[in-house]
Amino acid sequence: MHILRFSDLCAQGQARGQRVFIRADLNVPQDDAGRITEDTRIRASVPCIQMALEAGAAVMVTSHLGRPTEGEFKPEDSLAPVAQRLSELLGREVPLVADWVDGVQVQPGQVVLLENCRVNKGEKKNDPELAKKMAQLCDIYVNDAFGTAHRAEGTTYGIAEYAKVACAGPLLAAEIDAIQTALAHPKRPLVAIVAGSKVSTKLTILQSLSKNVDGLVVGGGIANTFMLAAGLPIGKSLAEPDLVNEAKAVIAAMAARGAEVPIPTDVVVAKAFAADAPATVKKASEVAEDDLILDIGPETAAQLAAQLKAAGTIVWNGPVGVFEFDQFAGGTKAIAQAIAESSAFSIAGGGDTLAAIAKYGIEKDVGYISTGGGAFLEVLEGKTLPAIEILQKRAAG
């Protein structure tokens, strides 16, 4: 995949004295008082900003925050808390600029944060007039926001059409490289773990991966539907009986390629979904009518761990059990540890997956941790993301 990279432009001295517009993803969670509760995305944006400053550019950074109404600015929509955190991380003041579409004052060696881009009318619909105005603000447009790459908006797509130069920042470039390594040119065997509560939300991902992967591990409520498809009892567990035929089709598609969807041979059940519910390990064929399946059993976990350790590439999206409750966390912990110990290139994404990675402290053992939720899922579906597509078009001239 050919795209221009901001790091290359900087290395060649092409950013010196230039006005650089960086679209970052600074959409961080806040508490009721507006305080930032988790700043990973802000920290992840720093290398691109530092790169631009060190290259001698005049730097403008923007992002969306929350879901403001276009054309109506409210105090809770402000990037002010982000500007404060960014100032701390960069060790310099980062002024916040409102009403910036018609012009921004910034000198080489300076950085300013442009107020919440989703307040601008036409941002979400990718209005060409807005896009042209934003493109006129800069000499180089840099997209460093993988988390919004699946949306064709003014600051992710439109500006890239009209800017003199459009390129990928280091975070976006790293995401693209990791995805290429894992899905376009994987070292085999390629094993994907797709878990979550519903097949319906991840059916297109399962269908897309079933054409490419050597092993497709399902977990959570998704696994219950696959157990139904295999003729196993699931008691009163969460499942989607109306999607059993789709599950059977995924199993058949894998089998036709000599690959498999491993169905659990044992499970961990409880009579209630609760933090203090007693857990019981049962054979998959012996689940009672009043049982809730809340994790895979130790035998299944050991089989999957062996498969992951022998893999060449691993894609992980979703914990395989209710890992928030320790008695139903064994399966997810075993999978996390197997990924950590495997020599495979691994890529992981999705909020719950990141929480599991943090819980078991394996951040340094995962090849690449994706910052994008919805964008990561769309990549797994085999879709080309609009923000990446426009950078490819611009690179091709």
UniProtKB/Swiss-Prot annotation:
Keywords: ATP-binding, Cytoplasm, Glycolysis, Kinase, Nucleotide-binding, Transferase. Disulfide bonds: none annotated. It catalyses: (2R)-3-phosphoglycerate + ATP = (2R)-3-phospho-glyceroyl phosphate + ADP. GO terms for cellular component: cytosol. One of its GO terms (biological process) is gluconeogenesis. ATP binds at K202, E324, G350, G351, D352, T353. Pathway: Carbohydrate degradation; glycolysis; pyruvate from D-glyceraldehyde 3-phosphate: step 2/5. Substrate binds at D25, L26, N27, R41, H64, L65, G66, R67, R118, R151. InterPro entries: Phosphoglycerate_kinase (IPR001576), Phosphoglycerate_kinase_CS (IPR015911), Phosphoglycerate_kinase_N (IPR015824), Phosphoglycerate_kinase_sf (IPR036043). The keyword Transcription does not apply. It is found in: Cytoplasm. It holds the Pfam family PGK. One of its GO terms (molecular function) is ATP binding. It comes from the Bacteria. Its EC number is 2.7.2.3. Monomer. Belongs to the phosphoglycerate kinase family. This is Phosphoglycerate kinase. It comes from Acidovorax sp. (strain JS42). The gene is pgk.
